[in-house]
Regions:
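Extracellular/luminal low-complexity segments enriched in Ser/Thr/Pro
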Residues: 354-362, 369
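C-terminal outer-membrane/trafficking sorting elements
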Residues: 392-403, 407-471
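Residue-level detector of functionally pivotal "anchor" positions at catalytic/ligand-binding pockets or at interdomain
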Residues: 302-310, 384-403
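Short, exposed coil/turn segments at beta-strand boundaries within extracellular/luminal domains
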Residues: 372-380, 459-465
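A domain-level signal for the mature, folded cores of soluble proteins
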Residues: 22-101, 126-302
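Acidic, glycine-anchored loop motifs typical of Ca2+
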Residues: 111-120, 138-140, 149, 157, ...
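Solvent-exposed, low-complexity, repeat-rich "mucin-like" stalks and linkers
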Residues: 305-338
Length: 471
């Protein structure tokens, strides 16, 4: 009898937990930007709405910068500090390791009680929000190139920039939202406004494209985990511990002045593509979401609540100086008076008292930011430095390539002219050198530890560097 009572109690707890789970209940607005999945079901038509309601395995694209969706839950989502890691809901996308298509997230409380998202939006400020590269109220106007097939789409913004969203060979339909599926979008041009964050796209490895993950606070940024999707991940650590996806704390909300605001609960969520970039054969960066889930209280599930974030260095630094930026967060809120110390891995560079990096020659750099008040918190960034030698290589000069990537015991280097090669570790140490012959040369790297390396080839008229991986 006692055993039956115990089992009955456990069953009741489990059933109660399932019953309390909240998912997207209603989509109020879906207005995507152009993109490769637009006008294609199920990702890029209104049919995608049904997929994201009631679960976390739908398929909805928001397109390139500015595309958005507004949704709500059946009941308000409470800002509950008793939730795991203090987070209140999780949004799931189709991100994976080294591939992020980040979206900004906004929340709204139904203050007038009419059940509609017509009150004030508050952005949940993510890890990159306070960096100088982030643009608030970035407006992009998309122009319809016409026709029913894929054509490059012109765009311009309110900062004087313009360009083309370049189509690829894999999606041949028009990438501009069609009147058939999106009659409310102007068939000639339309403007989308939102927060832009600078993302880091790496195409240095042959056949491999990476869009590096932001630390926290953006949708379609972290991969889905294998754990219960109702048990969130800690947004302040890099490991995927539970559900994966991207967990959000309502306490990250800021107003139009960039000031944190206290909101006890929210009724509506807006997810909006926040990046702009081409990933080569993979197409444009475009946020996708699969669903969202409310988080239930569990005060026993706790973890790290502080994180140091350093603004991305360029993949290749071609200037002799660069302003470094870092931010320190406690419970996802930035600490405004935090101070940082910087250390560099090589004597080719130093950081001055104003956090400006000064570089004296080309090479490989690893820079570590440390919280001055607590050296436990650090963040490291790497980059290749290519300063001008005063001799410009002609545009038709051959380059060299490295394959396979990743390599194992051997790496092949293909070049049509001789040179001197150096293999560098991530911290700038030379670990292998030699003379590079013409055509294809096989180099033994079996003695090198798996990880990322840089191959520098010095020609008679300049230097070139490639990044590759050994596994």
């Amino acid at each position: 009898m006692i055993m039956k009572r115990v089992l009955f109690t456990i069953l009741c707890i489990v059933v109660a937990g399932i019953a309390s789970a909240q998912y997207i209940n209603r989509v109020f607005d879906y207005k995507p930007a152009p993109g490769q999945f637009i006008n294609v079901s199920p990702w890029g038509t209104p049919a995608a709405i049904d997929g994201v309601i009631g679960g976390v395995y739908g398929n909805m694209t928001l397109g390139a910068f500015g595309g958005y969706v507004v949704f709500g839950f059946e009941a308000p989502v409470e800002n509950d500090p008793q939730n795991p890691f203090g987070v209140d809901f999780t949004i799931f996308g189709n991100a994976y390791s080294n591939w992020s298509e980040p979206a900004a997230v906004f929340v709204m409380k139904d203050e007038n009680g009419n059940g509609l998202p017509d009150d004030s939006w508050y952005q949940l400020a993510g890890s990159d929000h306070f960096f100088s590269s982030t643009k608030i109220n970035n407006e992009i106007t998309w122009e319809n190139p016409g026709g029913e097939s894929a054509l490059d789409i012109p765009w311009s913004d309110n900062f004087g920039n313009s360009g083309l969203l370049e189509v690829n060979e894999f999606h041949l339909q028009s990438w501009y939202p069609s009147q058939e599926f999106f009659p409310e979008i102007d068939p000639l041009e339309y403007m989308l406004s939102g927060t832009f964050i600078d993302t880091k796209i790496d195409t240095s490895s042959q056949g491999i494209v990476k869009s590096y993950v932001r630390t926290f606070g953006y949708a379609d940024n972290h991969a889905r985990g294998v754990g219960d999707h109702l048990i969130p991940d800690n947004p302040y650590t890099s490991e995927i511990e539970n559900s994966g996806g991207d967990a959000f704390d309502i306490s990250w909300a800021i107003n139009d002045l960039g000031e944190y605001v206290d909101i006890d609960q929210i009724d509506f969520v807006k997810v909006q593509s926040a990046s702009m970039g081409s990933a080569g054969w993979l197409g444009e960066l475009s946020t996708e979401i699969c669903g969202a889930a409310d988080v239930a209280p569990d005060p026993q599930l706790k973890g790290e609540d502080k994180v140091l974030v350093m603004k991305d260095l360029p993949l290749v630094l071609k200037s002799s100086s660069l302003q470094l930026e870092s931010a320190f967060f406690i419970d996802g809120r930035v600490v405004p008076d935090a101070r940082f110390d910087y250390a560099v891995s090589s004597d080719i560079a130093y950081v001055d008292e104003k956090s400006v990096l000064h570089v004296e020659e080309s090479g490989i750099l690893s820079i570590t930011a440390t919280l001055a008040s607590n050296p436990q918190y650090t963040c490291t960034q790497e980059c290749v430095v290519e300063l001008s030698t005063g001799i410009e290589m002609a545009s038709d000069d051959p380059t060299f390539s490295v394959f396979p990537v990743p390599a194992t015991d051997f790496v092949n280097v293909k070049s049509v002219r001789p040179g001197i090669y150096h293999f560098f570790t991530g911290n700038g140490q030379i670990c292998l050198s030699g003379e590079l012959e013409t055509s294809v040369q096989q180099i033994d790297v079996s003695h090198l530890t798996p990880g990322f390396y840089f191959l520098s080839v010095i020609y008679s008229d300049g230097k070139q560097i490639r990044k590759f991986m050994i596994q």
